[in-house]
Each structure stands twice: as C-alpha cells, then as structure tokens.
Amino acid sequence: MFREMRRKKQKLTEKQCIDILKKAKTATLALHGDDGYPYSVPVNYVYLDGKIYFHGAKSGHKIDAIKNNPKVSISIIDQEDVIEEELTTYFRSIILFGKAKILQDDDEIYQAVNALGLKYCNDEVAVEKEIQREWKNLCCVEIIIEHLTGKQAIELVK
C-alpha cells in the first residue's frame, strides 16, 4: 500500500521517527484541497498515545478538506544544515500518512488540547484558562498513523 524507501541506508528507525514527532514544534499537514489541488498548511501538534492531535477553528479550509477526504500526510523537518562547500544539505525528516478524524467526545478533546497546550507552555493555569476561553469555538482533530518513515542525509548515517 505504501511505497518502500529506495535508499534504505538513509532510513530512520521507528524510534528515531517517534523521537522527532515528540520534539518537533511544527509540522506541515497535507490534505486534499479544493478542485483537485493539494492543500498544505503548517500546524502545531502534539504526539499522544501513538496519534497526532491538532486544533483549530470549527470551520475553514482544513476542516472542509478533512470532511471531504480524511486521508492526510504530515511532514516534519528535524534538521536542515546547508553545507555550501559541498553543495548539499545535511537533512533529517519524517513523513507520515494517516486518517484524520474530527473529535466529538468532550473528554477526548480536552485531553488532546490540554496535552497540546502543555507541550508549548509549562503554565498549567494559563493552559486551562485558554482552553476554557476557547472551548466553544474549538475543533480538535486526531490523526491515526497508518505509515511512518524517516530519512536522513547519507552524511549523517553512522
């Protein structure tokens, strides 16, 4: 179903991929957009219990795209060091494929947005206040990961 990586020496382990998912701050979410065009958008997210969660408004391009087709892809660049004298980039990145689901259960939504808030802010009181302030306008999306892979520059392979 998913393609195998051609350059297997450069493939990251599953643990390396998950470590990147846990520490990265921003990902690019790719969706099936309007009129057959791809739609990609940066999102803040949290990796929790083997799934990806992000939040946003209850309506808009992202939510419409997910409702029309739940198949998504996420990419994250972990490292991108341009080495001018070698005319190359020492990179490390991951890509995942999965299915997005708009959460309906208040407990699931709260758990996800609380974890998301605490990923970016250590102040539990501030996170709780923000959740309460935005709750009625909040939409939370869960991505069930179906395929996860990562790759790094050959120069980084040990």
Labelled PLM ranges:
Residues 2-9, 81-158:
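Charged, gly/pro-rich active-site loop segments
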Residues 14, 59-60:
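Structural motif corresponding to alpha-helix initiation and N-cap regions
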Residues 1-23:
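Extreme N-terminal tail/first-helix region
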Residues 21, 65-66, 116:
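A generic structural signal for nonpolar/aromatic side chains embedded in well-ordered alpha-helices
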Residues 26, 40-42, 71, 95-97, ...:
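Broad gene-expression machinery/nucleic-acid interaction feature
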Residues 22-24, 37-38, 87, 136:
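Short solvent-exposed loop/turn micro-motifs enriched in small/polar/acidic residues
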Residues 24-58, 74-75:
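Short beta-strand segments
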Residues 55, 61-91:
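Helix-adjacent hinge/juxtasegments
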